[in-house]
Curated annotation (Swiss-Prot):
It is a multi-pass membrane protein. Heme b b562 binds at H83, H182. The cytochrome bc1 complex contains 3 respiratory subunits (MT-CYB, CYC1 and UQCRFS1), 2 core proteins (UQCRC1 and UQCRC2) and probably 6 low-molecular weight proteins. Its cofactor is heme b. A ubiquinone binds at H201. This is Cytochrome b.
């Protein structure tokens, strides 16, 4: 008699995705980040659910309800710290996952890649509305500044901003709807993740060599299930260590002050994982231009598959493009640093140069390097 997991309509789906899935035998630890993102999402939904049980989305009580969670709710401080720092780990895993995709040419699975970019945008939106909920100074002013960017949309901008605010400024209506969105989006992300996996399993995983691995596949369980488990332990160790020993390390001190519309903080800046995009936004001295650059800094990922010129898939055997990849990584770090700095010399010019380099690598240098490497292959 056939095994139940192979015949049962529901178990069969799980079996084909998690047990009997044929996986390339040579995928490295860089392929762990997909499952880690699944763990991050599950952790955020669970901790978020428990926080939502005690949180009130009203401007008069939001800040004190967060204080109440940390002081009076059993292990509330732990749940909140894991949720806040879990977002940071979520974005670390996302950026590693995208970097892996760029390095090894995984973006050539176009549907999987484009759903991934949509997932990134959804996650960024979720994190943004979530940051507003504690209703501290940086929550309020961050919401004001970022939503105000929509006023740069020609003709309908002003009306659009007021529609999102639910009034003439960031107020109670804004907080209430942001809480509703923050509760809803993770489930949209979970649904999009299922699509992401569905399209991935149509083709199977890519591998570090960038060649067809049909001749050498191994089953997902036990090999990669245990490998993923090791990743889970490592990440949870890092997350709990941060949440227990330095919970406020990555936060902004301004958010310990309740929101005050009459006092503007000296430096309005988002959480660290948005600083690179914030630096690109600020590097253009024009509102609409800045907003478009901000948008395109993420959407540029969608044109990467179109601009792939190389005959090889990954960068494993392509030293020229490898150099460009690591230049891009360094450039992202510089942009992250600049995003947290005040708008003054020399930070302005550094940010502008780094922004130009960011787009040049994606749109000009990487396709040129691929073409040059093809030429070099012809000479041998």
């Amino acid at each position: 008699m056939a095994n139940l997991r192979k015949t049962h309509p529901l178990l069969k789906i799980a079996n084909d995705a998690l047990v009997d899935l044929p996986a390339p035998s040579n995928i490295s630890v860089w392929w762990n980040f997909g499952s880690l993102l699944g763990l991050c999402l599950a952790t955020q939904i669970l901790t978020g659910l428990f926080l939502a049980m005690h949180y009130t989305s009203d401007i008069s009580t939001a800040f004190s309800s967060v204080c109440h969670i940390c002081r009076d709710v059993s292990y509330g401080w732990l749940i909140r710290n894991i949720h806040a720092n879990g977002a940071s780990f979520f974005f670390i895993c996302i950026y590693m996952h995208i970097a892996r995709g760029l390095y090894y040419g995984s973006y050539l699975y176009k549907e999987t890649w484009n759903i991934g970019v949509v997932l990134l945008l959804l996650t960024m939106m979720t994190a943004f509305v979530g940051y507003v909920l504690p209703w501290g100074q940086m929550s309020f002013w961050g919401a004001t500044v970022i939503t105000n960017l929509l006023s740069a949309v020609p003709y309908v901008g002003g009306a659009l901003v007021q529609w999102i605010w639910g009034g003439f400024s960031v107020d109670n209506a804004t907080l209430t709807r942001f809480f509703a969105f923050h509760f809803l989006f993770p489930f949209v992300i979970a649904a999009a993740t299922v699509l992401h996996l569905l399209f991935l399993h149509e083709t199977g995983s890519n591998n570090p060599a960038g060649i067809n691995s049909d001749a050498d596949k191994i089953s997902f369980h036990p090999y990669f299930s245990y490998k993923d488990l090791l990743g889970f332990v490592a990440m949870l160790l890092g997350l709990t260590s941060l949440a227990l020993f330095a919970p406020n390390l990555l936060g902004d001190p301004d958010n310990f002050t309740p929101a005050n519309p009459l006092v503007t903080p000296p430096h309005i800046k988002p959480e660290w994982y948005f600083l690179f995009a914030y630096a690109i936004l600020r590097s253009i001295p024009n509102k609409l231009g800045g907003v478009l650059a901000l948008l395109f800094s993420i959407l540029v990922l969608m044109v990467v598959p179109i601009l792939h010129t190389s005959k090889q898939r990954g960068l494993t055997f392509r030293p020229l493009t490898q150099f460009l990849f690591w230049t891009l990584v360094a450039d992202m770090l510089i942009l992250t640093w600049i995003g947290g700095m005040p708008v003054e010399h020399p930070f302005i010019i550094i940010g502008q140069v780094a922004s130009v380099i960011y787009f040049t690598i994606f749109l000009v240098l990487a396709p040129l390097a691929g073409w040059a490497e093809n030429k070099a292959l012809e000479w041998t």
